[in-house]
A protein has these predicted regions:
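N-terminal Rossmann-fold NAD(P) dinucleotide-binding loop
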Residues: 2-3
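Rossmann-fold cofactor-recognition segment
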Residues: 30-42
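NAD(P)H-binding glycine-rich loop region in Rossmannoid oxidoreductase-like domains
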Residues: 40-79
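A conserved pocket-lining segment of Rossmann-fold NAD(P)-dependent short-chain dehydrogenase/reductase
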Residues: 69-70, 130-134, 161, 166, ...
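Conserved Rossmann-fold NAD(P)-dependent oxidoreductase catalytic core, especially the SDR/UDP-sugar
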Residues: 85-138
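Active-site Tyr-X1-5-Lys
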Residues: 115-118, 134-171, 202
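Glycine/proline-rich active-site loop of Rossmann-fold NAD(P)-dependent oxidoreductases
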Residues: 144, 167, 179-195, 222-223, ...
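C-terminal substrate-binding subdomain of Rossmann-fold SDR/epimerase-dehydratase oxidoreductases
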Residues: 205, 210-213, 218-301
Length: 301
C-alpha cells in the first residue's frame, strides 16, 4: 500500500517524507521529498523527523500482520501498538509545536472483528463497525487498540495536564478487508490466500490454498484501498460521525477465486489443503461488512 500511496500523493503534488524498514527503490524514492530507512519503534528517528519537518498529515501503515503476529505475538504488540503509540506521540508533538491539528490516517483491518463461531458468521449478515469486537489474533487485538488510541489522542489526550493541547490529532481509520495487488506478492497476512492463488497461477506455479473452498471474507483491490484512504483524508471533518469506518467491495469465496483464476489461467494447479489454525482465524472474520457510514459520511463507493 505504501508504494501506491506515495504514487498517488506525488501525483497530487504533495511532498512526502517516507519511512520504511528498507531503503526505497529508486523509482519510489524519486517521488518523495525525503526517505528514511528505519523502524517506528526507534524513538530517536521519530525525534529527528519531529525536529526537521512540519508535518500536517500522517499515513501510518507499518504493521506486523496477522499470520506472522501469531508466531511472535509479543513482537507484534511492540510494533503494532508500541509503534503506533510512538507515531501518535509524534503527531501530538507536531500539533503542539506548530499550533495545528495533525491529520492521522490509520489503516485498520477486519482482523479487529472476532465472531464466536462459524454458525454466528453465517448468520451475521453485513457486520457494522461496533459489533463482534473480540478479535482472535494479536494483530486484530493490536488494530483494535490502535483505533482506541487514536480516539484517545483525538479527544482526551493529556486530559488533566494544565498545558494540554486540546484535540491535537484528527484521527481517521478504515477497517480494510483483504487487499489484492497486481504489483506485489503478499506475505504475512491470513487473507493472502486469494492474492497468493492469483500470483501463483500467473507465475505457472501450483498453489495449495490454506482455507476451505466455501470460505468467504470481504476483499478489495489495492487501487480501491488507496482511493478509500484518500477519500477519507479529504472528507470535511464536520461530515464525519465516527473515527473508524468499514469499506467493502466484493466478498468472493475461495472457490470463486479458483474459478476466476482458471478462467484466466486454464492450466492453473490449485488444491485446497485447509490449515486448521489459519482457517479458524478467517472463520472469525465477517463474510460481509456494512459500509453504510462510509457511504453516507464521505461518499465511499
Amino acid at each position: 500500500m505504501g508504494h501506491g500511496l506515495i504514487e498517488a500523493l506525488h501525483g497530487a503534488g504533495r511532498p512526502v517524507v517516507a519511512v520504511d524498514l528498507r531503503e526505497l527503490e529508486a523509482g519510489v524514492r524519486a517521488k518523495c521529498r525525503s526517505a528514511y530507512a528505519g523502524n517506528i519503534c526507534d524513538t530517536a528517528l521519530l525525534d529527528r523527523l519531529h525536529a526537521q519537518y512540519e508535518v500536517g498529515e500522517i499515513y501510518h501503515l507499518a504493521a506486523l500482520l496477522s499470520t506472522r503476529g501469531e508466531f511472535a505475538p509479543e513482537t507484534a504488540h511492540q510494533v503494532n501498538v508500541g509503534g503506533t503509540l510512538n507515531v501518535l506521540h509524534l503527531a501530538a508533538e507536531q500539533a503542539r509545536s506548530h499550533g495545528q491539528r495533525v491529520k492521522f490516517l490509520f489503516p485498520s483491518s477486519i482482523a479487529a472483528y472476532g465472531l464466536p463461531s462459524l454458525d454466528a458468521k453465517n448468520h451475521a449478515g453485513k457486520v457494522a463497525e461496533d459489533c463482534y469486537s473480540h478479535p482472535h489474533t494479536m494483530y486484530g487485538v493490536n488494530k483494535l487498540a490502535g483505533e482506541e488510541l487514536g480516539r484517545y489522542y483525538e479527544s482526551h489526550y493529556r486530559k488533566l495536564a494544565r498545558d494540554r493541547t486540546p484535540h491535537p490529532i484528527d484521527f481517521r481509520s478504515i477497517r480494510f478487508p483483504g487487499i489484492i495487488s497486481s504489483e506485489t506478492t503478499p506475505s504475512g497476512g491470513t487473507s493472502d490466500y486469494g492474492p497468493e492463488m492469483i500470483h501463483a497461477a500467473a507465475q505457472g506455479k501450483p498453489y495449495e490454498c490454506f482455507v476451505r473452498p466455501d470460505t468467504r471474507i470481504p476483499f478489495m483491490t489495492m487501487p480501491e484501498a488507496i482511493d478509500a484512504l484518500l477519500r477519507l483524508a479529504q472528507a470535511p471533518k464536520e461530515r464525519l460521525t465516527r473515527t473508524v469506518y468499514n469499506v467493502s467491495s466484493f466478498s468472493p469465496s475461495a472457490a470463486d477465486f479458483e474459478r476466476l483464476v482458471r478462467q484466466a489461467y486454464p492450466h492453473a494447479a490449485v488444491t485446497f489443503v485447509p490449515d486448521l489454525g489459519r482457517q479458524a482465524i478467517v472463520d472469525s472474520w465477517p463474510a460481509e461488512c456494512c459500509d453504510r457510514a462510509a457511504r453516507t459520511d464521505w461518499d465511499w463507493k
